[in-house]
Amino acid sequence: MKRINVLSEETSNKIAAGEVVERPASVVKELVENSIDANAKNITIEIKESGKDSIKISDDGIGIHPNDIEKAFMPHGTSKISLIEDLYSINTFGFRGEALPSIAAVSNVLLKSKTMDSDFGKEILVSGGRINHIKDTACNIGTVISVENLFFNVPAREKFLKSDRRESSLISNIINRLALANHNISFKYYTNNKKTLMTYASSDVKNTIRSIYGKNIYENIISFEEHSDIVSVYGYIGNSEISRGSRNNQSIFVNKRYIKSGTITAAVENAFKSFSTVNKFPFFVLFVDIYPEFIDVNVHPTKSEVKFQDERIIYKVVFDAVHSALSTSIKESFNINKDSIFDDKDTTYNLIQDETPKQEQVQIPIDLQNKRSDSIIENLPKFNPNVSYEKPKDSCRENCLNSIDINLKNTTEELKTKDIYYENSISASPKDNILCEKSQSKNIDNYNTIEAKFPRLNILGQFNKTYILAESLDTFYMIDQHAAHEKILFEKFKNQIENRDVISQILLTPVIIEMSAEDFAYYSENINIFHESGFVTEVFGDNIISIREAPMLLGKVSTKDFFLEIFDDIKNMGNGNIAKIKHNMISSLACKAAIKANHTLSYEEMNSLIEDLRYIEEPFNCPHGRPTIIKLTLKEIEKKFKRIQ
């Protein structure tokens, strides 16, 4: 029968060391964090043979009191906390008092330290957890600690270390993160007496980013910032040019502590998805400042994870900060001149019609997916790109109206369900129309408050039945008609769902769906998502539901397929990801309903599409991240033709 033994102090110390000291990078992290806690302004790290032979950390901090030198190597000896309640208001990196004794248990440690009030410093040598000597020494204010022969008494641990190159890479990685988190401190890092990194104290982390990652990263990052009552989020995110296939260049700091957080990473990447190609991960350096009582840092031996009291708040603040910054950055790149939104500075565009209009205003639907609309516009004058379109006079409007025979009753009744309305399409020239899907739900006066996100464009034509070509001043534009229409519909559907304005239509024949017991339970738990999306359902039997009404915005999309698509997202992502589920749902619907590539558009349809795009909230990327519109300046084109250098 096996008996219970009490482990010796030496054995228990080695076991405890295994929790804190996994590899040389762990030692560097713990010692540099101690220097930061000591209010150091300059920290030097010197590594030899990937840290296996020697690790030396020097700082100019406040030092260790001479009488506390020995206590520093005792288990749970710390100056950071004294009561259990202090755990809920921690503002330092260390607090357990485990680092130094754990490191000393598996290596030879020489520490020298001096405080400002002392005439001389103290030196202590600890080998394998045992103190060899403590004596006075001459040294500068601050602390110098050398760790040699790491794992000399634990050969099994040393055997599992990676190659020297890999271990050095891990050390560099942790030093980079510590330098980013503490950009107000100067860092010097030497590997085998060769300078590897040097940063200078700066109030802006962007300067430290340049020192670590280089000029290319520095020139392609965008700042973001968001605040709430309990948390502030700020930092930098890279644009799509520097996105990568891995998450290696992502850094999260909570109260300056480098951590890994699935919640924060998901928030950033979901915000980034709308502006970049799929399967790419963004570069970002993100700081979260939060009251200590709202987090728990004592949930992981290496403190690499924290627990938030309310992860939903954190997710929302991070998502909003990143999404807003990316959206603003793309918008600013188009350099819209508010003084010349309507092309001609000499012409004041009047959104409100004359008090005594010459003709009654009509709305003619233009179906971008159905050629039925061709019969409505077939008699329109052909568009000539060589002719400049000026605002017509009233007599011209009357002539245009009188020249085309339109049965208003039939037009409105037969095509009243079409998506896009082209107001005064018969009589108006391009400068007379605001062709926007918002016209279905907002009156003309409201357009005065809607800001155009890019200049009014002069349409040149269509290329490959897929891309609309246009110009404005000295800039050439190309618009992907599918991506543009998809984003217009996405914004429209999103607004309807968010505002709970989704109109449902009764199905002629209810759709019956049989489910397993597990699936039916998922459905029951998340029935509100379906109701908010415009579905009206009822239980039709054991694990059977009947869809009585479906959202009108579905159009020709299969009701059953779309319902099951939402359901699969709920199962795969969990009901904690409601925002992502709704985003996927709306983007999928918009993609299916939008006009496709290889579809010929008339001038009026192209103009209508572009005008709709100008006035939506975020017009520059489709929901899947592809650009809707790209531009080339005259200068860029002339460079291509070698006209200029």
UniProtKB/Swiss-Prot annotation:
Coiled-coil region: none
Superkingdom: Bacteria
Keywords: DNA damage, DNA repair
Gene Ontology terms, MF aspect: ATP binding; ATP hydrolysis activity; ATP-dependent DNA damage sensor activity; mismatched DNA binding
GO biological process: mismatch repair
Entry-linked InterPro entries: DNA_mismatch_repair_CS (IPR014762), DNA_mismatch_repair_MutL (IPR020667), DNA_mismatch_S5_2-like (IPR013507), HATPase_C_sf (IPR036890), MutL/Mlh/PMS (IPR002099), MutL/Mlh/Pms-like (IPR038973), MutL_C (IPR014790), MutL_C_dimsub (IPR042120)
Key word Protease present: no
CDD domains reported in the protein's UniProt record: HATPase_MutL-MLH-PMS-like, MutL_Trans
Keyword Nucleus: no
GO cellular component: mismatch repair complex
Function, as annotated: This protein is involved in the repair of mismatches in DNA. It is required for dam-dependent methyl-directed DNA mismatch repair. May act as a 'molecular matchmaker', a protein that promotes the formation of a stable complex between two or more DNA-binding proteins in an ATP-dependent manner without itself being part of a final effector complex.
Family: Belongs to the DNA mismatch repair MutL/HexB family.
Protein's name in the database: DNA mismatch repair protein MutL
Organism: Clostridium novyi (strain NT)
